[in-house]
């Protein structure tokens, strides 16, 4: 194996190792798996990534990722359009969808507020949220930020921001441990948290 190829493979392993949940050993196994049958496995992955890169866009309404400018959730006639869940990222949106227990709409903040990083609240897409609440006649806002310090800080800030809107504001409840992130919880736990949500003041 010449030096150029060796460096290319090392770079592939390094890139895999930077994916969430993967260390260098897992990355090496994945790279080897793909390279051992590269005409099928590697090319299939490459083709899929190219297609995703071409098609995936951010939903203009909620911030979800989909192949349409207005995602399947926002455009669905079967969703309860009187309830909106506020999540930090698309990962939490997908976690709630996997639970199969939430049939409302979403609003992806894209960030949370961290005292340590002194982030500006303007990054949270709250003006868009307030506009949606009035325009879509939202009856309940579920704050589904994570149970981390940053998530709690963000939740309180959102509550203050939405005071001028009459919607009921609730918070995910039982089953979310302190410091817990929705994306790492099983579907049953997320379902319980949705069902047992409590008023948030």
From Swiss-Prot:
It comes from the Bacteria. GO terms for molecular function: DNA binding; zinc ion binding. GO terms for biological process: DNA recombination; DNA repair. Keywords: DNA damage, DNA recombination, DNA repair, Metal-binding, Zinc, Zinc-finger. The keyword Zinc-finger applies. InterPro entries: DNA_Rcmb_RecR, Rcmb_RecR, Rcmb_RecR_Znf, TOPRIM_dom, TOPRIM_RecR. Residues 82-177 form the Toprim domain. A zinc finger (C4-type) spans 59-74. The keyword Zinc applies. PROSITE patterns: RECR, TOPRIM. Belongs to the RecR family. PANTHER family: RECOMBINATION PROTEIN RECR. May play a role in DNA repair. It seems to be involved in an RecBC-independent recombinational process of DNA repair. It may act with RecF and RecO. HAMAP family: RecR. NCBIfam families: recR. This is Recombination protein RecR. It comes from Rickettsia rickettsii (strain Sheila Smith).
């Amino acid at each position: 194996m010449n030096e150029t190829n060796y460096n290319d493979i090392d770079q592939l392993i390094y890139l895999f190792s930077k994916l969430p949940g993967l260390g260098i050993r897992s990355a090496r196994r994945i790279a080897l798996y793909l390279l051992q049958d590269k005409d099928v496995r590697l090319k299939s992955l490459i083709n899929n990534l190219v297609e995703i890169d071409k098609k995936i866009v951010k939903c203009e309404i909620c911030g979800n990722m989909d192949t349409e400018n207005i995602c399947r959730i926002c455009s669905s006639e079967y969703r309860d359009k009187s309830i909106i869940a506020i999540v930090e990222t698309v990962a939490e949106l997908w976690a709630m969808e996997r639970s199969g227990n939430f049939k409302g709409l979403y609003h992806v903040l894209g960030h949370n507020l961290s005292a340590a990083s002194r982030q500006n609240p303007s990054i949270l897409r709250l003006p868009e949220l307030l506009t949606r609440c009035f325009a879509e006649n939202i009856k309940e806002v579920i704050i589904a930020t994570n149970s981390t310090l940053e998530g709690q800080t963000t939740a309180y800030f959102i509550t203050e921001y939405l005071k001028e809107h009459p919607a009921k504001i609730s918070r995910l409840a039982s089953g979310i441990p302190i410091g817990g992130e929705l994306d790492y919880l099983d579907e049953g736990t997320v379902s319980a948290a949705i069902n047992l949500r409590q008023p948030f003041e």
